[in-house]
Amino acid sequence: HGHILPEPSQIPRFMKDKNLFWIDEDKKFMRQGDWSRPINSSNFFIKEKIEWMNQHRIDHAVMLCLSQLYCNGWEEQDCIDGIRFQNDFNASIQTDYPQRFTCGFVVQPRYIQHALKEIDRCVNDLGLKLLCLPSHFLNSKGEWLSTAEEDLDPIFELANKYSLAIQIHPYDGEKMIALKNKYWRFH
């Protein structure tokens, strides 16, 4: 799988203003609060991604949501707005380049009613068929819960109704899995 980053100008202003997520204007770092990660290749952006795929003879790729935009710990309205941005962005990539990309969409399990509405929107309005979920999430009490919690069965039931593929992204993998960060990378 891969990721496509939005151009800095595509990210809604509120996300940077609230320290939720942004990309520096020079495209060298993506940031969230005090966290930052270097953007070590220009092929995280659409034009360069397609050039890279052509160079390596990759016809079609699966693009997943950024784990930073799973919105863990975000207030409800920020979460709704952030997820809508991520899903609309991924849908635009899939719509503009349907022969090149299958893109995922994300929902936040903490806000289950919104999650169910967003699944409906992403499938019926945006044509997305790959649901991306975090392995665990922060509930309203600040506790980490597994996405496999029984209370979240409606998410999986709706995904099953729509025959969605589901990708579970491990959060904080380096804290849970004792593998060297040599042949793969936690992100």
What role is predicted for each listed range?
Residues 1-187:
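Helix-coil boundary/capping segments in enzymes
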